[in-house]
């Protein structure tokens, strides 16, 4: 069957499936949502739809996207080299065994700023700066942008996958960031931050438990310190700067929870995600302050119990595989001791490697590391969302995996050597008849093993079960 004919056949089926899945994703407000712990377990393995709805100019002195006339949502979605997202891409990830997608979204370009100060200067042969002081982003999100975000969320939900929606490059080290880990900045931006989250929450208040909100991405202090707060100060640590940063992170987290809960509906018990300072994971042993982002993070007060999740990010050098594995092991232990112990499960909202061109130059190490990372995280009850890659650029249009071996390593890290198979059998948590457990190739097993098995129940029915 030709690809063109197949697409004509598949797209209407996807549209019908999306309609039913989205309808079933809405849950009555009086029905109990699964706990945060259950949600993290049920996400299994995840991926980031990165460099897409999060794309932005990111530099007040070079607002190159905003210089375009008649900007449309697609201009931003494709600005960093990715195609317009199609539902077939998410279907491909679902069929491969991924059960969750994080959808990073940058909001500031799509609010009230006009960017009228951004013009081409013939004398300097450069764009004039964005005058943020006189062209404020305000508090209202543009409806065209919200509509596109809503469509992409629906693409994920329609596949019966978990979707994490966040505020992304409104934080970070760019000059356009307005969310900064500093007590004075928090006091100034609190109202705006809460207003944005109330709008997002209202837009999706009827969605069911498969949709989660993440309050903010990698929020940094006024010095743009990575690894831990105040690391970028001249002395490499400043207690005053650090204290302000950690206090601000906890304040933003509380504001986020309060704003979402105030909208009612299913948001009253929706699972919500809060990140540590910079989404730092405490990885490494080279500085005594590396654990501070974990230790200083507080679990926000919440009107409901068991519906909050912590998030960290991890990028590790894979040139030395043994060292990388040891770093993963220690990081997982530290997260369990210094963060999960506060009373909420944890996810790696992003993970990958700091090694340049690792897929081309250190592929065997990268593949082994990827599998090991997912295995270690799963053993520690930590969710994983790989950052970018796997299907990138034009490969997303086909769609296809342009790093299929890396995808396989991640999938086998969670499901075991046999990988993932979406067999059309009902799932069960029940025990099989002794001696009636088979692997996905039909081989009888002496006892259930890790991953997906086919089992015969006492009533004679056949089902599939994931054994952890």
Residue ranges and their predicted role:
Residues 12-23:
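Bacterial N-terminal signal peptides
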Residues 424-468:
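C-terminal outer-membrane/trafficking sorting elements
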Residues 410-419, 460-467:
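Short, low-complexity, Pro/Ser/Thr/Gly-rich segments in the mature regions of secreted, periplasmic
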């Amino acid at each position: 069957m030709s690809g063109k004919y197949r697409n004509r056949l598949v797209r209407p089926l996807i549209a019908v499936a999306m309609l039913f899945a989205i309808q079933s994703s809405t849950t009555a407000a009086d029905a109990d949502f699964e706990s945060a712990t259950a949600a993290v377990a049920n996400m299994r393995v995840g991926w980031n739809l990165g460099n897409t709805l999060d794309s932005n100019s990111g530099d007040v002195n070079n607002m190159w996207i905003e210089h375009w006339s008649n900007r449309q949502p697609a201009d931003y979605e494709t600005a960093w080299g990715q195609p317009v997202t199609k539902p077939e891409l998410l279907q491909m990830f679902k069929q491969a065994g991924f059960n969750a997608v994080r959808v990073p979204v940058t909001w500031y370009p799509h609010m009230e700023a006009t960017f009228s100060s951004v013009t081409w200067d013939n004398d300097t042969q450069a764009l004039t700066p964005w005058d943020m002081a006189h062209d404020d982003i305000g508090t209202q999100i543009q409806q065209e942008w919200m509509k596109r975000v809503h469509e992409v969320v629906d693409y994920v939900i329609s596949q019966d996958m978990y979707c994490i929606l966040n505020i992304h490059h409104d934080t970070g080290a760019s000059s356009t960031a307005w969310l900064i880990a500093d007590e004075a900045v928090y006091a100034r931006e609190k109202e705006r931050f809460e207003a944005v989250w109330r709008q997002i929450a209202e837009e999706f208040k009827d969605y069911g438990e498969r949709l989660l909100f993440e309050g903010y991405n990698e929020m940094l202090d006024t010095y743009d310190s990575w690894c831990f707060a105040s690391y970028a100060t001249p002395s490499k640590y400043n207690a005053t700067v650090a204290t302000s940063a950690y206090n601000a992170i906890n304040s933003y987290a509380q504001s986020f929870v309060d704003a979402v809960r105030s909208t009612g509906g299913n948001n009253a018990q929706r699972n919500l995600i809060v990140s540590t300072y910079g989404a730092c994971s405490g990885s490494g042993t080279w500085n005594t302050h590396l654990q501070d982002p974990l230790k200083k993070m507080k679990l926000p007060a919440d009107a409901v119990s068991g519906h909050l999740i912590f998030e960290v990010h991890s990028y590790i050098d894979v040139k030395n595989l043994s060292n990388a594995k040891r770093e993963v092991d220690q990081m997982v232990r530290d997260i369990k001791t210094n963060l999960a112990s506060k009373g909420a499960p944890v996810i790696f909202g992003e993970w990958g490697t700091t090694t340049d061109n690792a897929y081309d130059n250190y592929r065997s190490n990268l593949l082994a590391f990827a599998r090991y990372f997912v295995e270690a995280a799963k053993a520690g009850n930590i969710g994983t969302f790989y950052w970018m890659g796997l299907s990138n650029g034009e490969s997303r249009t086909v769609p296809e995996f342009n790093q299929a071996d890396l995808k396989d390593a991640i999938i086998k890290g969670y499901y075991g050597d046999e990988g993932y198979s979406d067999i059309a059998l009902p799932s069960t948590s029940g025990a099989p008849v002794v001696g009636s457990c088979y692997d996905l190739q039909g081989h009888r097993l002496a006892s259930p093993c890790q991953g997906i098995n086919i089992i015969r129940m006492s009533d004679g029915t056949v089902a599939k079960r994931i054994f952890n």
